[in-house]
């Protein structure tokens, strides 16, 4: 008996030693390894024949010919918005349901536009991508089909715009980057929140130094989806969340703060840690709708990141509990502060704003929000040039208050004029990879996970974010 106990004890010690050795030596059975207390994902070298897409501008396309794939929830709104953009031809409409295609054909008819080609079925997108009279494929399917469709489109010479998240794994992020670099085709993720009026104005303020040096930023997607789960075809979104841990929908909160911090434009994401709660409401919903007995996604997930330039970022995900809608969007600077949710407001320091923004005799409170009068004056004084150009029409056309139209308008404007896009393939990869990275951190007791450098060392070659105009 004593011998057996001794054998078991020695075996346990050996397992522990081997596990520690694996962590120190970088051995892992996954697509990542453990190095010096950090989880590090594989970063493939750039293949021969590939070139960076930083600052890439394609040849101008005066009339952009578009094919839409995915017409269930987000797709129809995009089709409608495109009918309000000049210099666009809608060549194809694709979905797995004929009724969704028919609905969008009616939109074209009502707008006085020609009927587009109809493509119905799970593989029908391939025929659309193979057409020689299409320049751009606009993808708004369920998440797991984003990358396969985007890769096929780029391989057939098409630029692609992909709904969020662009990819659902680190491997898929690299596939988008490599295919875009090799085919020299734009790959833009359709992150609409970077174009919202408060976010874009605050980005402009941050880049002009109004807040001093940005030290900390926050973003989130907090949206109780209890009234929406039934609207997803075949429960695809609940099914995805049931299978995946981590922040699976980070980009709405994360993208805007990344642009404010000039990520891969003189700054980069270094590592993250993630912690999540157990699943209560998610499991309850999945049990009722799908008979699930387990649910991987925590009801609330929190992720912290550190940047190369010494800033921290916090992002949160919660689509299960009864809370007011909230994307946070918060910038903490050495000389100021901006906050969007749940209360919009600014804190400014004397001497940091343009002359005339602060009314004569007004004072600034370093312990509270500036007055609404000062807030409105600052929003007007630092309105982004893009909004100065298109805000009125955007609010008329709509799409989440107009930001969706600004996004689509800018995409087409840049393609028409042969300009670099506002969001490039590296944004798509950096913002989307948070899903798997956060899941792996949570799985390993909130262990730090290195964020891959999808630019392969070129993160400091561009000097800040720039929205190009002709």
Enumerate the predicted regions with their spans:
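Predominantly a Rossmann-like dinucleotide-binding segment in NAD(P)-dependent oxidoreductases
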Residues: 183-188, 193-296
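Bacterial N-terminal signal peptides that target proteins for export
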Residues: 1-8
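N-terminal Rossmann-like dinucleotide-binding module
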Residues: 23-111
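Beta-strand-loop-alpha-helix segment that lines the small-molecule cofactor/substrate pocket
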Residues: 136, 142-143, 147-195, 209
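Glycine-rich phosphate/pyrophosphate-binding beta-alpha loops
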Residues: 316-326
